[in-house]
């Protein structure tokens, strides 16, 4: 370890002379183990925080913990354009830095590769060429920082640099991690959602603007940051290395503050340039997203809402206007067709839509009223017709009954006593008198009675008499009636024929023969 540090101190002897004197005088093995152990813990914690933080955001937009929000936001899109530059720089810097930090590659692997691994492993999902660019620039940026700023104070001020860097790591990683994580928390909804939306929608703008901003800002960020790192690293190495001797909180503050200042200048300038450029591409792309994305999601949603609301409002209003016009017009035309035969016209369609159900209800009431009237008229007509028919039939029946009664009264004479019977026989003279002895309770008598009346109509020269056996008991005894019905025939007051029973043919033959 000491040979490599001595070799590296000899390699870097032109720029960083205070570190060589410090590297020869002071032992640094204990702060190495302190740095490696604490950098392992913090690298593991940074890995845990990065993996926990990046696990939720690996699918959307992976960003690095400490300083990769600069490059992750800036180097989102130019994967294919910037990757040949850091690939050559990767190999050269890896060869130079492996040759330089071969002894400290373990420490830089323990100290910086958790940064680079935590910073380079996660962006491989989202931007594998980006961490190549970012890790190479970050290796250009941080391995000279880590190799020169951290390794050389391991030569000179490992007690101070380890404590100060540990303190600066204790002080600055919550600042850098919390602030950058908060900036990630604050910027990733902006960067991840907006850049993802800018990836989805404004990759020509965001990629061209960010590629141009990367082409403009990589001379600014890479050259300006690398040059102030090259300029500030002699400053930060000369300033921070003596300040690492005395003022490593200055170097940690100055180096961390240039990390805070440069990274806020790089991160803020690059992040602000990212916020400015990401916000410019994000604001431009977000504004273009707000112009495009809100035009596409919001304006497209609003335009969709406008288009949907305009086609929906216009189409819905047109549908409301057309559906009230089409449906209401068709309904109203149906209602007009229904109401025009019912109520002849409905004037305003929109005003009369409440009128149309009322009118339809009223028309239905009128229809029901007309139906009731027709039903009542039908009932009245049917009742009237049925009553009239019944009355006509009853009148006809009554007329027939009256005729029958008149026939009965006129043609068949009912005998009530014996004196009347003898008087009729005297008045008849030589005419044939047919007498029917019957009773109301006798069934064959009721059956023969209509036939007897019909024969009285047929034979006008024959006198037909009817005797109720219950009313004229004395006459029944005198005439010796033993069966019902019994028919007797008289001529010149003398009995000429007689038979008993409901014999229709014999009755007709007897009347025709004895007449």
Swiss-Prot record:
<dbReference type="InterPro" id="IPR050620">
    <property type="entry name" value="Thioredoxin_H-type-like"/>
</dbReference>
<feature type="disulfide bond" description="Redox-active">
    <location>
        <begin position="442"/>
        <end position="445"/>
    </location>
</feature>
<keyword id="KW-0597">Phosphoprotein</keyword>
<feature type="repeat" description="7">
    <location>
        <begin position="182"/>
        <end position="196"/>
    </location>
</feature>
<feature type="repeat" description="16">
    <location>
        <begin position="317"/>
        <end position="331"/>
    </location>
</feature>
<keyword id="KW-0963">Cytoplasm</keyword>
<feature type="region of interest" description="Disordered">
    <location>
        <begin position="51"/>
        <end position="390"/>
    </location>
</feature>
<feature type="repeat" description="12">
    <location>
        <begin position="257"/>
        <end position="271"/>
    </location>
</feature>
<feature type="compositionally biased region" description="Polar residues">
    <location>
        <begin position="375"/>
        <end position="384"/>
    </location>
</feature>
<dbReference type="GO" id="GO:0003756">
    <property type="term" value="F:protein disulfide isomerase activity"/>
</dbReference>
<feature type="repeat" description="18">
    <location>
        <begin position="347"/>
        <end position="362"/>
    </location>
</feature>
<dbReference type="Pfam" id="PF00085">
    <property type="entry name" value="Thioredoxin"/>
</dbReference>
<dbReference type="GO" id="GO:0036126">
    <property type="term" value="C:sperm flagellum"/>
</dbReference>
<feature type="repeat" description="14">
    <location>
        <begin position="287"/>
        <end position="301"/>
    </location>
</feature>
<feature type="region of interest" description="Disordered">
    <location>
        <begin position="1"/>
        <end position="23"/>
    </location>
</feature>
<dbReference type="GO" id="GO:0030154">
    <property type="term" value="P:cell differentiation"/>
</dbReference>
<keyword id="KW-0676">Redox-active center</keyword>
<feature type="repeat" description="8">
    <location>
        <begin position="197"/>
        <end position="211"/>
    </location>
</feature>
<dbReference type="InterPro" id="IPR013766">
    <property type="entry name" value="Thioredoxin_domain"/>
</dbReference>
<feature type="region of interest" description="21 X 15 AA approximate tandem repeat of Q-P-K-X-G-D-I-P-K-S-[PS]-E-[KE]-X-I">
    <location>
        <begin position="92"/>
        <end position="405"/>
    </location>
</feature>
<feature type="repeat" description="4">
    <location>
        <begin position="137"/>
        <end position="151"/>
    </location>
</feature>
<protein>
    <recommendedName>
        <fullName>Thioredoxin domain-containing protein 2</fullName>
    </recommendedName>
</protein>
<feature type="repeat" description="17">
    <location>
        <begin position="332"/>
        <end position="346"/>
    </location>
</feature>
<feature type="repeat" description="3">
    <location>
        <begin position="122"/>
        <end position="136"/>
    </location>
</feature>
<feature type="modified residue" description="Phosphoserine">
    <location>
        <position position="14"/>
    </location>
</feature>
<keyword id="KW-0677">Repeat</keyword>
<dbReference type="GO" id="GO:0007283">
    <property type="term" value="P:spermatogenesis"/>
</dbReference>
<feature type="repeat" description="11">
    <location>
        <begin position="242"/>
        <end position="256"/>
    </location>
</feature>
<keyword id="KW-0744">Spermatogenesis</keyword>
<feature type="repeat" description="20">
    <location>
        <begin position="376"/>
        <end position="390"/>
    </location>
</feature>
<feature type="compositionally biased region" description="Polar residues">
    <location>
        <begin position="85"/>
        <end position="136"/>
    </location>
</feature>
<keyword id="KW-0217">Developmental protein</keyword>
<keyword id="KW-1015">Disulfide bond</keyword>
<feature type="modified residue" description="Phosphoserine">
    <location>
        <position position="146"/>
    </location>
</feature>
<feature type="repeat" description="9">
    <location>
        <begin position="212"/>
        <end position="226"/>
    </location>
</feature>
<feature type="repeat" description="1">
    <location>
        <begin position="92"/>
        <end position="106"/>
    </location>
</feature>
<feature type="modified residue" description="Phosphoserine">
    <location>
        <position position="39"/>
    </location>
</feature>
<feature type="repeat" description="5">
    <location>
        <begin position="152"/>
        <end position="166"/>
    </location>
</feature>
<feature type="compositionally biased region" description="Basic and acidic residues">
    <location>
        <begin position="302"/>
        <end position="358"/>
    </location>
</feature>
<feature type="repeat" description="13">
    <location>
        <begin position="272"/>
        <end position="286"/>
    </location>
</feature>
<dbReference type="InterPro" id="IPR036249">
    <property type="entry name" value="Thioredoxin-like_sf"/>
</dbReference>
<feature type="domain" description="Thioredoxin">
    <location>
        <begin position="398"/>
        <end position="515"/>
    </location>
</feature>
């Amino acid at each position: 370890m000491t040979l490599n540090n001595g070799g590296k101190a000899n390699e870097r002897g032109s720029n960083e002379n205070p570190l060589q004197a410090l590297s020869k005088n002071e032992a640094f093995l204990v702060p190495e183990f302190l740095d490696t152990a604490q950098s392992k813990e913090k690298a593991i914690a940074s890995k845990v925080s990065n993996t926990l933080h990046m696990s939720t955001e690996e699918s959307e937009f992976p960003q690095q913990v400490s300083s990769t929000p600069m490059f992750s936001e800036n180097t989102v899109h130019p994967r294919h354009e910037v990757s040949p530059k850091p690939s050559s720089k990767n190999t050269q810097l890896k060869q130079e830095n492996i040759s330089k930090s071969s002894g400290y590659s373990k420490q830089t692997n323990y100290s910086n590769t958790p940064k680079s691994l935590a910073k380079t492993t996660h962006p491989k999902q989202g931007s594998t060429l980006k961490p190549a660019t970012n890790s190479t620039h970050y290796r250009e940026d941080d391995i000279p920082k880590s190799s020169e700023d951290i390794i050389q104070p391991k030569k000179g001020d490992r007690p101070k640099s380890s404590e100060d860097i540990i303190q600066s790591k204790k002080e600055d990683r919550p600042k850098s991690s919390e602030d950058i994580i908060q900036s990630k928390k604050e910027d990733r909804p902006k960067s991840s959602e907006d850049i993802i939306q800018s990836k989805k929608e404004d990759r020509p703008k965001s990629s061209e603007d960010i590629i141009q901003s990367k082409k403009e800002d990589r001379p600014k960020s890479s050259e300006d940051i690398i040059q102030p790192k090259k300029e500030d690293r002699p400053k930060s190495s000369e300033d921070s290395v003596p300040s690492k001797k005395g003022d490593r909180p200055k170097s940690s503050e100055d180096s961390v503050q240039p990390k805070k200042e440069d990274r806020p200048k790089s991160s803020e300038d690059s992040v602000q340039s990212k916020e400015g450029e990401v916000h410019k591409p994000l604001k431009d792309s977000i504004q273009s997203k707000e112009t495009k994305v809100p035009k596409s999601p919001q304006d497209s949603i609003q335009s969709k809402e406008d288009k949907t609301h305009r086609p929906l409002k216009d189409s819905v209003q047109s549908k409301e206007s057309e559906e009230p016009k089409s449906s209401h017009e068709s309904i109203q035309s149906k209602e007009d067709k229904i109401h025009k035969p019912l109520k002849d016209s409905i004037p305003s369609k929109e005003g009369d839509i409440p009128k149309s159900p009322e009118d339809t209800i009223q028309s239905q009431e009128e229809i029901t009223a007309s139906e009731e009237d027709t039903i009542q008229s039908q009932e009245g007509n049917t009742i009237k017709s049925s009553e009239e028919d019944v009355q006509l039939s009853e009148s006809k029946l009554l007329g027939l009954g009256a005729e029958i009664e008149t026939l009965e009264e006129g043609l068949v004479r009912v005998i009530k006593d014996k004196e009347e019977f003898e008087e009729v026989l005297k008045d008849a003279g030589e005419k044939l008198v047919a007498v029917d002895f019957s009773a109301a309770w006798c069934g064959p008598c009721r059956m023969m009675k209509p036939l007897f009346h019909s024969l009285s109509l047929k034979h006008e020269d024959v006198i037909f008499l009817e005797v109720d056996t219950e009313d004229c008991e004395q006459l029944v005894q005198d005439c010796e009636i033993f069966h019902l019905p019994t028919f007797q025939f008289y001529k010149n007051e003398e009995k000429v024929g007689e038979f008993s029973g409901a014999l229709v043919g014999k009755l007709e033959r007897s009347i025709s023969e004895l007449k």
